[in-house]
């Protein structure tokens, strides 16, 4: 039974958005860039920020008022949106590299001519793809390592936009435009603005995994489709293996529907074959399996130095600050939980398990270069949390007041996240 929206629930939404605004303002005005927030004066200038804020609030307000529900997930719409997004990602690409990003140029320049690619088991296919991309583009057009990474990042962003729009009918039919606006408002979008690291392609593949899983839950594809998508993602970066609990949930649904484990066993076999074939190929092409034990994943198996146990308080405060940047709408989880707006359908449970799995990574996996420098390591958790939250928000906006409040939430998130993205773009200028 759907609970009727009440005035007290609306007030709770307004309070959550107000708290979100206050936290953003504290990061901006009280601490500036020192708190990994944004410095509006350096990023935009006050007048530019004010104009941007006014335009954003007006556009999202009109979307909230009219709440257009015509379908936007058509193939043509998704392809056009993806194509139009690429130049936006490129024009605003980052000029800030973290410690790992700065190390990629000497590593690839040393290893690619020698063995064909710079490789580790942690991010195997990401590094292989970027190594070969740089090798060919450097030969043909003289591209640098950074330039090749940034082209791949923006292309992954266009792919993500395509998948996001294709998701809307399945995930947020009551308010598709609000869902898209909300998901695009997270700090994890920096991944697709030319980020020079090994998470961008993985993020796009994980988005495909979510789409494939939703299609499986709606009976459109077999279980092997999302299973192989997740296996490919894990081959690109082992971080994606933290999503196996969500794959187990899909296997449970398959067993409940069919009454046997045959489909789940076949899907698991396909996924394991992909991963085994990947590792076996590189055993004979530059990355022996024995080196797995010196990787971060290998250290994790030995419980050696990768878990955030007994860290100083500042570490956990940085994690909280980062999480609020990656998923600004997280405070909306409070009223959504109190009024039970998440639902118990299979897609909601799947998204919840996926988000929880990646948030567990953020809680227990220790950053090796500092939390704020390692923001992209934890970005998938913010992305999946936003998909989960904005699905619930889109399903709960049943009156004009809720629509406007949700639009305000998206506007605050956009201003904070994209001020940071612009600040990174202007870095060094």
Name each model feature, range by range.
Residues 26, 263-336, 358-362:
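Membrane-lumen/periplasm interface segments of specific transmembrane helices
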Residues 223-238, 244-249:
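Membrane-interface alpha helices of multi-pass inner-membrane proteins
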Residues 212-218, 243-273, 337-344:
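Perimembrane helix-loop-helix junctions
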Residues 191-201:
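Short acidic/glycine- and proline-prone juxtamembrane loop motifs at membrane-interface regions
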Residues 58-67, 162-165, 318-345:
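Hydrophobic, aromatic-rich transmembrane alpha-helices
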Residues 170, 209-224:
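Membrane-interface transmembrane helices that cradle and orient dolichyl/undecaprenyl
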Residues 90-108, 116-133, 143-147:
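Extracytoplasmic catalytic/substrate-binding loops of multi-pass membrane glycan-assembly enzymes
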Residues 151-171, 208:
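Transmembrane-helix motifs of polytopic, lipid-linked glycan transferases
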């Amino acid at each position: 039974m759907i609970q009727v929206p009440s005035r007290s629930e609306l007030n709770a939404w307004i309070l959550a958005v107000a708290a979100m605004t206050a936290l953003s303002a504290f990061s901006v005005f009280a601490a500036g860039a020192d708190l990994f927030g944004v410095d509006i004066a350096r990023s935009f200038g006050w007048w530019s920020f004010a104009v941007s804020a006014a335009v954003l609030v007006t556009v999202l307000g009109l979307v909230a008022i009219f709440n257009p529900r015509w379908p936007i997930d058509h193939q043509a719409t998704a392809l056009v949106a993806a194509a139009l997004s690429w130049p936006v990602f490129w024009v605003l690409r980052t000029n800030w590299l973290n410690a790992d990003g700065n190390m990629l140029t000497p590593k690839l320049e040393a290893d690619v001519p020698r063995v064909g690619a710079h490789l580790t088991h942690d991010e195997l296919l990401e590094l292989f793809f970027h190594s070969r991309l740089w090798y060919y583009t450097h030969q043909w057009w003289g591209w640098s390592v950074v330039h090749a990474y940034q082209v791949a990042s923006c292309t992954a962003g266009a792919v993500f936009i395509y998948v996001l729009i294709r998701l809307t009918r399945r995930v947020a039919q009551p308010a598709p435009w609000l869902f898209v606006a909300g998901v695009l408002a997270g700090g994890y979008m920096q991944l697709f603005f030319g980020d020079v690291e090994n998470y961008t392609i993985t993020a796009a593949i994980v988005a495909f995994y979510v789409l494939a899983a939703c299609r499986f839950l709606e009976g459109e594809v077999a279980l092997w489709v999302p299973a192989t998508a997740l296996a490919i993602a894990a081959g690109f970066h082992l971080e994606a293996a933290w999503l196996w609990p969500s794959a187990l949930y899909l296997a449970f649904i398959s067993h409940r529907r069919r009454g046997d484990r045959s489909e789940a066993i076949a899907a698991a076999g396909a996924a394991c074959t992909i991963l085994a074939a990947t590792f076996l190929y590189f055993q004979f092409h530059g990355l022996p399996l024995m080196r797995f034990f010196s990787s971060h994943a290998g250290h994790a198996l030995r419980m050696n130095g990768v878990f955030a146990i007994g860290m100083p308080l500042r570490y956990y405060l940085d994690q909280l600050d980062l999480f609020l940047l990656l998923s600004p709408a997280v405070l909306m989880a409070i009223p959504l939980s109190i009024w039970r707006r998440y639902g118990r359908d299979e897609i909601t449970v799947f998204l919840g398990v996926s988000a929880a799995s990646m948030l567990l990574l953020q809680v227990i996996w220790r950053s090796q270069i500092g939390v704020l420098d390692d923001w992209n390591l934890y970005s998938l958790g913010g992305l999946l949390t936003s998909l989960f939250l904005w699905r619930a928000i889109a399903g709960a906006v049943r009156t004009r007041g809720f629509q406007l409040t949700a639009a305000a939430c998206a506007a605050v998130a956009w201003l904070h996240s994209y001020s940071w993205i612009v600040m990174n773009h202007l870095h060094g200028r």
